[in-house]
């Protein structure tokens, strides 16, 4: 099983912009969630090796989303047990 985050934050920011009309950048998201901008950029690029769960919770709060909106599980076609 693989977990990916590639592009998820950008997609969620786009959805938020469509709903509210307010344009936000990854840098602004990092500021709102009080997390390092480098973490946000690495997470969106799918390059984060370790993930701070508190930081993820703050990102979810800032984006008004759930954890599985950011983290995508790929089972490679296998069914869960």
Can you name each region flagged by the protein language model?
Residues 20-43:
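Short alpha-helical DNA-recognition segment
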Residues 1-28:
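A short, Lys/Arg-rich alpha-helix, primarily the initiator
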Residues 14, 45, 75:
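Residue-level detection of the helix-turn-helix DNA-binding "recognition helix"
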Residues 23, 47-58:
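Short, basic-rich loop-to-helix N-cap that marks the start of a DNA-contacting helix
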Residues 54-69:
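DNA major-groove recognition helix of helix-turn-helix/homeodomain DNA-binding modules
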Residues 71-81:
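Short, charged recognition helix plus adjacent turn
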């Amino acid at each position: 099983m693989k977990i990916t985050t590639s592009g998820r934050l950008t997609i969620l920011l786009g959805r938020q912009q469509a709903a509210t009309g307010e344009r936000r950048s990854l840098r602004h998201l990092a500021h709102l969630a009080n997390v390092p901008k480098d973490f946000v950029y690495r997470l969106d690029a799918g390059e984060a090796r370790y993930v701070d769960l508190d930081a993820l919770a703050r990102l979810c709060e800032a984006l008004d989303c759930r954890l599985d909106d950011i983290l995508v599980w790929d089972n490679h076609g296998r069914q869960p047990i």
